[in-house]
């Protein structure tokens, strides 16, 4: 049995007099989940039981607790990784999963992005500026309306047009007909502009449905899809990424706030580890509550390339506006896709003109 370990950091709110016992409790809970006195196998005690590697007082009753967990307990299963690092401990409402030092063995197992930032840029033949994107919405709009909207947005020169994450396989717009129609709408826009805008359908459902939808997207000539890892599950995402090597995967953060996992780890780190080529997240200053510091750490984690995995594209979203283009890109930098949805849609019949204004603002950003 190997004794290779990786370090997991938790933020624990506790009294100073209790923190050592709390840390030891997490180490046991996230490994063998039983009284150590009941274990008589020396290999289990030495190689499997979690170890407390350090405790730091970070103020205001909060402690950073570092636990060493056995790499062998993860195997090759994405779900088991989550189970081992936060399974039962997630049931304690005073603990946050803050960071995971992913060892090379697990990085190789899960693989990270198959394409990453550079491949996305290559597909668009685009370098030297940030990328642009928007979303097809609202749900409830019939297929023809979504397809027309997709065409008008594409005529504005966007790099990516994605489904809103609320679009699924619904009676008023079935997945197969919607994706075919929206892909055709984007293609018409591309013929008008000459710019290779990508359409990103949202995949939903169980694994069989996800596979069918990914296959349909592939058959339509699409090379990007979106899914919500916290909805479909990490194992399903892991399977799709492996089975669809030509597809670039955009990860949506829906339900990401329910797990008490630090956003910079969950969205910027774990989504990337599971194969997301681009990670969508709610940026500061929009309609969600992430701070600038959290957003910066998330983007840094997504763009890492020092761990033998490719860099994923950060996609700040969630109430962004055209007027904030310079501010947002000054903050995140060039290797970013700025996603603006509702603010563009406010233009209604002038959506193409407003989209052109957005794409010009991004193109002009690096010109000073």
Language-model regions, residue ranges each:
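Active-site mouth loops of central-metabolism enzymes
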Residues: 10-17, 130-147, 197-209, 253-263, ...
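Alpha-helix-loop-beta-strand connector modules within alpha/beta enzyme cores
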Residues: 30-31, 45-49, 175-201, 234-255, ...
């Amino acid at each position: 049995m190997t004794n290779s370990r990786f370090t997991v950091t938790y933020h624990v709110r506790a009294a100073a007099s209790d923190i050592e016992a709390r840390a030891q409790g997490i180490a046991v809970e996230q490994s063998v989940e039983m009284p150590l006195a009941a274990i008589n196998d020396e290999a289990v005690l030495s190689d499997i039981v979690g170890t407390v590697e350090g405790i730091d007082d970070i103020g205001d009753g909060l402690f950073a607790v570092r636990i060493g967990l056995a790499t062998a307990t993860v195997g090759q299963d994405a779900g088991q990784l989550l189970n081992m690092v936060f399974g039962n401990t997630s049931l304690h409402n005073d603990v946050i999963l803050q960071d995971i030092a992913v060892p090379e063995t697990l990085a190789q197992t899960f693989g990270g992005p198959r394409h990453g930032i550079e491949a996305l840029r290559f597909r668009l033949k685009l370098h030297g500026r940030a990328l642009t994107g928007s979303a097809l919405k609202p749900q409830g709009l019939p297929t023809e309306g979504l397809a027309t909207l997709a065409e008008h947005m594409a005529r504005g020169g966007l790099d990516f047009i994605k489904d809103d994450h609320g679009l699924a396989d619904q009676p008023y717009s079935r997945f197969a007909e919607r994706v075919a129609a929206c892909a055709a709408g984007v293609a018409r826009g591309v013929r008008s502009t000459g710019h290779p805008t990508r359409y990103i359908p949202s995949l939903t459902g169980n694994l069989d449905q996800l596979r069918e939808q990914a296959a349909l997207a592939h058959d339509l000539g699409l090379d990007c899809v979106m899914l919500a890892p916290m909805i479909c599950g990490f194992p399903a995402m892991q399977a799709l990424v492996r089975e669809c090597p030509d597809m670039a995967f955009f990860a949506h953060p829906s339900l990401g706030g329910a797990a008490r996992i630090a956003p910079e780890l969950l969205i910027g780190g774990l989504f990337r580890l599971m194969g997301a080529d681009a990670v969508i997240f709610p940026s500061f200053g929009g309609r969600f509550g992430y701070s600038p510091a959290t957003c910066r750490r998330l983007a840094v984690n997504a763009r890492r390339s020092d761990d033998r995995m490719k860099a994923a594209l950060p996609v700040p979203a969630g109430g962004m506006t055209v007027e904030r283009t310079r501010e947002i890109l000054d903050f995140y930098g060039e290797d970013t896709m700025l996603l603006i949805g509702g603010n563009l849609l406010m233009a209604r019949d002038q959506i193409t003109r407003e989209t052109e204004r957005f794409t010009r603002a991004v193109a002009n950003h690096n010109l000073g």
